[in-house]
């Protein structure tokens, strides 16, 4: 019983460390609780700051679920205790004691906890999220579908009915946190994930512009991840200084020609004056 209480406290306190708020404060981004969807989670940080900050928050949130579950396994806790430790980490993420109980929706923390609890279950849940997000481009729909299937994946792969209640409670909490997303999905007002490629490609690949800037620091680099009109505008902007140089050279040559022609026009006037004398 003492081990159970200890692990529940550790899981909840680790889950209460909200990485979205910390990352936004560290890098000078808007407060995710006040901007965007007003949810301090990875998806909102992705919209507010970009892909690199969204992935950073996603990794930290997953670690909040991974570390307490690994600790529970190292202490030889029973599977039910490990599952409740995962539940405590998710509750801490949703209702953090360090941030006035205003937290995220617990999707990344749940996936991290499942990866540590049973790796195959975690992979299946993560794969479900990626597939749904890739085809429909709704992060909320992907979260709802993947987390809802987690308890049933555990029944198929583990077959232990004792771990079903805590995993089912996680599902209920995640669905409750997505209640506003349900209404927006029904009304067709839910914002989509805005990527130019598929979600999987965007997560796996780095931006071409950043790699080019690292190879050629201090030089102008045309971004390859933009449309054709922006490319032509950037190309014209790069060529403009050369045109200016050419025009200045032309002005210099014309001024030289004018100065050379002026003495020739004055010589005949002096000759006519001498002839009159």
From Swiss-Prot:
Biased composition of type Basic residues is found at 240-253, 262-271
Reactions it catalyzes: an acyl phosphate + sn-glycerol 3-phosphate = a 1-acyl-sn-glycero-3-phosphate + phosphate
**Cell inner membrane: is it a keyword of this entry?**
yes
What cellular component terms from Gene Ontology apply here? plasma membrane
Localization per Swiss-Prot or TrEMBL = Cell inner membrane
Which class of enzymes does this protein belong to?
transferase
What Enzyme Commission number(s) does the record list for this chain?
A: 2.3.1.275
Membrane topology term: Multi-pass membrane protein
Q: List the InterPro entries.
A: G3P_acylTferase_PlsY
Keyword terms of this UniProt record: Cell inner membrane, Cell membrane, Lipid biosynthesis, Lipid metabolism, Membrane, Phospholipid biosynthesis, Phospholipid metabolism, Transferase, Transmembrane, Transmembrane helix
The record's listing under HAMAP family reads: PlsY
Tell me its family. Belongs to the PlsY family.
Recorded hits in NCBIfam families, A to Z, give: glycerol-3-phosphate 1-O-acyltransferase PlsY
Quaternary structure and partners: Probably interacts with PlsX.
Entry function: Catalyzes the transfer of an acyl group from acyl-phosphate (acyl-PO(4)) to glycerol-3-phosphate (G3P) to form lysophosphatidic acid (LPA). This enzyme utilizes acyl-phosphate as fatty acyl donor, but not acyl-CoA or acyl-ACP.
Q: Write the protein's name.
A: Glycerol-3-phosphate acyltransferase
């Amino acid at each position: 019983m003492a081990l159970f209480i200890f692990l529940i406290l550790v899981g909840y306190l680790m889950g209460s460390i909200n990485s979205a708020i910390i990352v936004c404060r560290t890098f000078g981004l808007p407060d995710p609780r006040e901007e965007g969807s007003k949810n301090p989670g990875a998806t909102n940080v992705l919209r507010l700051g970009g892909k690199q900050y969204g992935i950073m928050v996603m990794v930290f949130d997953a670690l909040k679920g991974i570390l307490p579950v690994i600790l529970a396994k190292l202490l030889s806790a029973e599977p039910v205790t490990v599952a409740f430790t995962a539940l405590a980490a998710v509750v801490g993420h949703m209702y953090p004691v360090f941030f006035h109980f205003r937290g995220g929706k617990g999707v990344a923390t749940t996936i991290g906890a499942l990866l540590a609890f049973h790796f195959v279950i975690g992979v299946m849940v993560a794969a479900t999220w990626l597939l749904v997000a890739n085809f429909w481009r709704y992060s909320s729909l992907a979260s709802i579908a993947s987390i809802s299937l987690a308890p049933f994946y555990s029944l198929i792969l583990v077959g232990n009915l004792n771990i079903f209640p805590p995993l089912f409670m996680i599902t209920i909490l995640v669905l409750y946190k997505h209640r506003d997303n349900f209404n927006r999905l029904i009304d067709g007002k839910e914002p989509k994930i805005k990527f130019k490629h598929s979600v999987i490609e965007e997560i796996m690949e780095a931006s071409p512009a950043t790699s080019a800037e690292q190879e050629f620091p201090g030089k102008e680099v045309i971004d390859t991840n933009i449309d054709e009109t922006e490319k032509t505008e950037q190309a014209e902007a790069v060529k403009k200084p050369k045109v200016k140089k050419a025009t200045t050279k032309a002005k210099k040559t014309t001024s030289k020609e004018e100065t050379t022609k002026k003495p020739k026009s004055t010589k005949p006037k002096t000759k006519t004056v001498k002839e009159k004398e």
